[in-house]
């Protein structure tokens, strides 16, 4: 399931993040990639232990916890601290699949990358190219969202970032281990949750509502791992 999450950040929050990122100490992104991925990667990235990366990452985690659409779609169990990248001057990232398991910095813990996420800090008209291109069974999807918007897509997806031929593309990216590992099951729960919300608004006294809610929670109980 691929899903856009609009307005994760307010205009004021977005402006503060951008001002900080524009002054950041960017490093060669290949330093954080594995051997194979490094051959396809041509961008800049904040070091994970950079104080700004830590500060902004904690801020974004707080925002995600208050974003209902993200919670309902991702059903997050663990979220890897967000990372930050910068593309300019032809920077790109060739086709790759993200690692299945990531270590949580500064801890002995690891997470499984069920869901990949990208949050855009740059407006689409501020740079040329730079589309996030995700491939699935239905073809290729080019994603270039307004600043403050985020996209979620399965961690199993082959994807790439097209060359940024003009301007600068700033973004955050991270991974989620979901309560529900299987993407198709998460998609069904998302659709069912949406149906419950519509029935709640349209006919709150409907006798079908408690049945739908029971079905949702029983499926979540069956499919989830905690």
From Swiss-Prot:
Binding site for 2-oxoglutarate: 169
One protein family per Pfam: 2OG-FeII_Oxy_3
An example Gene Ontology molecular-function term: 2-oxoglutarate-dependent dioxygenase activity
SMART domains in the cross-refs: P4Hc
Species assigned in the record: Parvibaculum lavamentivorans (strain DS-1 / DSM 13023 / NCIMB 13966)
Top class in the EC scheme: oxidoreductase
Keywords assigned by UniProt, alphabetized: Dioxygenase, Iron, Metal-binding, Oxidoreductase, Vitamin C
EC numbers: 1.14.11.-
List of residues binding Fe cation: 96, 98, 159
Domain Fe2OG dioxygenase, first and last residues per copy: 78-178
Cofactor note: Binds 1 Fe(2+) ion per subunit.
Known cofactor(s): Fe(2+); L-ascorbate
One GO term of the biological process aspect: DNA damage response
Name of protein: PKHD-type hydroxylase Plav_0377
